[in-house]
């Protein structure tokens, strides 16, 4: 028996890791009481409760990157060629920075995250290994060199992003508790 994955083995393995990272984030986020959701420690931009929509924005960003890669048939993609894109991203960032979710927002935040996570699943689940590994040169911002990007890379970044914010959630919660802000 070969260790070579099936035609869709690589996508399935990446999706499994992506799901596990999501589950770890959800477990960490579930530990945060509603009162902690608006907490923003000094030096941070985002409130604890903004992490789900922040994760969602990143997934939407990379779904768009992949759509552009596929539309270009894996030819070069220049995200900086869309001058309105930077403005939209800056506005989304600004909106997240000023958002201070409450417990009443929790179900909606998590529902939206689940829906976006599912869209990632639906978009990538049926891809074969060759497509998952295929790279396109993507210019992410003006003045930068193209970065060879594949679906496997995108999954790595999204999985790492969940992991980063799982750890951050624990740290923010501990900091919130130590400051006696509950």
Where are these regions (language model features)?
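Short, helix-capping/interhelical loops that line the mouth of catalytic, cofactor-
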Residues: 1-13, 61-113, 176-182
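Long, hydrophobic/aromatic N-terminal blocks
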Residues: 1-34
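A structural signal for alpha-helical segments
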Residues: 6-9, 13, 39, 43-50, ...
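Alpha-helical transition-metal enzyme core signature, strongest for iron centers
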Residues: 18-25, 48-66, 85-94, 99, ...
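Short hydrophobic/aromatic segments of transmembrane alpha-helices and their interfaces
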Residues: 19, 34, 114, 147-148
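Helix-loop segments that flank and shape redox-cofactor active sites
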Residues: 24-49, 68-76, 128-146, 175-179
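Individual transmembrane alpha-helices with interfacial aromatic-anchor signatures
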Residues: 143-158
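Terminal "cap-and-tail" regions of soluble proteins that handle hydrophobic small molecules
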Residues: 150-153, 170-182
